[in-house]
């Protein structure tokens, strides 16, 4: 399945952004300007399956898929780097990580709606499940606009493979599904 998602940052996210990435509050105007430039470039999608057909995953109910911000976030960071604007490139990368975290939440909500179950745990390949599942996931969800390189790297760079454990009972707030979510890709 393919699901359009629209990640964005809330007012609460701005405070978290500054503390998480060690920016002083006086950088917020620059950060917001880069965010304003980036947001129209983000073309985010989740490609996923709720079939229980991955080898080596023994959960009773789960979904798996790929979440991407599209090429725009990568291109903006690269544009800044090409012009030797390192701080701006770093800010763009940090913003895209926050947007990707928000996209994971939206992916989990889409899975909940499709499956009529609750997302109770979100895992990234390489954490609890082997990276060797990536080609299988890629083949099953057939993501247009995402490429898997010969070295099992996903392009665009702001793309992640996830497995969501599902249950009939809600156990956690979606923001609490993954212990590594606050550390991911840093």
Identify what each model region corresponds to.
Residues 1-88:
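Active-site helix-to-loop segments that bind/position phosphate- or nucleotide-bearing substrates
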Residues 29, 33, 95-98, 102, ...:
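Conserved active-site and cofactor/substrate-binding residues in soluble primary-metabolism enzymes
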Residues 59-127:
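Conserved mixed alpha/beta catalytic, RNA-binding, or beta-rich assembly cores of soluble enzyme
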Residues 104, 108, 134, 175-178:
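Hydrophobic, well-ordered secondary-structure segments
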Residues 116-162:
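Extended, compositionally biased
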Residues 125, 160-178:
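Immediate flanking context of iron-sulfur cluster ligation sites
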Residues 181:
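A residue-level signal for conserved active-site and pocket-lining positions in enzyme catalytic cores
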Residues 184-186:
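Conserved small/polar residues in nucleotide/adenosyl-binding loops
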């Amino acid at each position: 399945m393919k699901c359009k998602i629209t990640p964005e940052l809330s007012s609460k996210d701005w405070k978290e952004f500054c503390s998480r990435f060690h920016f002083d509050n006086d950088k917020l105007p620059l950060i917001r300007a880069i965010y304003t430039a980036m947001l129209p470039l983000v073309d985010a999608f989740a490609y996923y399956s709720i079939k229980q057909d991955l080898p080596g995953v023994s959960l009773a109910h789960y979904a798996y898929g790929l979440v991407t911000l599209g090429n725009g976030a990568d291109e903006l960071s690269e544009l800044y780097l090409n012009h030797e604007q390192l701080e701006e490139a770093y800010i763009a990368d940090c913003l895209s990580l926050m947007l990707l975290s928000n996209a994971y939440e939206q992916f989990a909500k889409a899975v909940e709606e499709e499956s009529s179950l609750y997302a109770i745990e979100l895992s990234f390949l390489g954490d609890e499940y082997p990276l060797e599942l990536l080609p299988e996931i890629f083949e099953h969800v057939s993501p247009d606009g995402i490429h898997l390189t010969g070295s099992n790297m996903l392009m665009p760079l702001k793309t992640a493979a996830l497995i969501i454990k599902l249950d009939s009972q809600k156990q956690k707030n979606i923001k609490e599904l993954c212990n590594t979510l606050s550390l991911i890709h840093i």
